[in-house]
Curated annotation (Swiss-Prot):
Pfam families: OMPdecase (PF00215). The active site is at residue 60. This is Orotidine 5'-phosphate decarboxylase. It comes from Wolbachia sp. subsp. Brugia malayi (strain TRS). Keywords: Decarboxylase, Lyase, Pyrimidine biosynthesis. Substrate binds at residues 9, 31, 58-67, 115, 176, 184, 204-205. GO terms for biological process: 'de novo' pyrimidine nucleobase biosynthetic process; 'de novo' UMP biosynthetic process.
Amino acid sequence: MNPIICALDTQDLNEAISLANTLRDKVGMIKLGLEFFAAHGPSGVREVAKCNVPTFLDLKLHDIPNTVAKTVEAIKVLNIEILTLHISGGTKMLEEALSIVKDTKTKLIGVTVLTSMSNEDLSELGIAREVKSQVILFAKLAKKVGLHGIVCSALEAQEVYQECGKDFKIITSGIRVGFGHDDQKRTATPKEAINSGADYIVIGRPITKSNSPANSAELILKSLS
């Protein structure tokens, strides 16, 4: 299994298609986010899917249960591999979303605490727990409800693995290669993430903005062995 999920963070459909074609044999999955979906909608997802690479649609859904269920109903026809939603939406929202995809190949993955957030950010929201404790709480709820796994940072992955077991998938974002700075606060290298128990690592710009995306993906994969 190739654990690399390449984030195609672009509004440019042609660029997304070109990257998907270039990387389809180099990564395990490609990720399309809210930026792409807002620009191109379901038709854009279908176009990228024609490149024959598994697709992860990262919409981080969070609304009342009925609205999320209807949204998942509309999305499930896209035949994607993974769809994300916020665990903080609560048990009923998660259960209703799961009921929609039960006969499809789409796996629902829960978002715990965004990797752009710190303990101080949680405190500002009135959440007394530290990030790691909040992630573990969300992970246990996600497993109890029946989600296929979660998204967290590598800093929490080992404890999630210990609490939830090997069949509960862990996708780590906030992965950094070399020296780069952005709005991520809880970061790790690809090797650190895999060693901590992650099943998949999400990597964007270190691959997509390199001179050779295919070569960069190959080098990252080799670094994991």
